[in-house]
Amino acid sequence: MTSKSLNAWVIHKQWSGDTSARLKLFTRELGLINCLCKGGRTPKKQSLLQAFIPLWVSIEERYDQYYTRNIESTSSRLDLEGHSLFSGLYINELLYYTLSPDFPDSDLFDAYLFTLNGIALAREREAIEALLRRFEWALLKACGYTFSFLHEARTGELIVPDSHYQFVAGEGFILGGDKKIPGEHLLAIAADNLSESAYLKSAKFIMRQAIDHLLGGREIKARSLYGPA
């Protein structure tokens, strides 16, 4: 039996029996894990086992199953409402459906923290949209699914600002095609320049297709709440 202490966020919760809760936690140390919290229905634990509360969780592993030993909050719940709330639910669903269990990635964990704190503070929708696009790219990288914004996918030639390209999921950008994206936009996105609404719109279009390819047909319910992506 091994015991570990983790920085964690609740991604999903399901009641189990009369007293327990089955949790899916996103942690810095172990990545996404499934964990059984005995006594999870007590008022104290119910107040902690919510999304968007940073937690310090002590767990033990028995017979390939994680069990919580102690749960504490390290700060108050993030103040998310409206579009910020739906965006937070969106990125939680992305983690739930795309990450393999027990695969830690500190860069993705940091991106998650940065995004949550950013959307909690953001007052404009475009600022939230930019944060979501950057998180989606971090998630794609963590899942090993990346493509170049600087080179044409099939020839390897440099993207030309005045040319137009089509995004092909699983490949990248090819010259021409029906749904054309200006090369200027691709180069701006490559430079992390989402300051122009046109660049942000193209980034949203590209990431939507890339994320859908990664999801493999699984539905993200938060999209229907407010259309964050």
UniProtKB/Swiss-Prot annotation:
Keywords: DNA damage, DNA recombination, DNA repair. One of its GO terms (cellular component) is bacterial nucleoid. Pfam families: RecO_C (PF02565), RecO_N (PF11967). GO terms for biological process: DNA recombination; double-strand break repair. HAMAP family: RecO. PANTHER family: DNA REPAIR PROTEIN RECO (PTHR33991:SF1). Involved in DNA repair and RecF pathway recombination. Belongs to the RecO family. This is DNA repair protein RecO. The gene is recO.
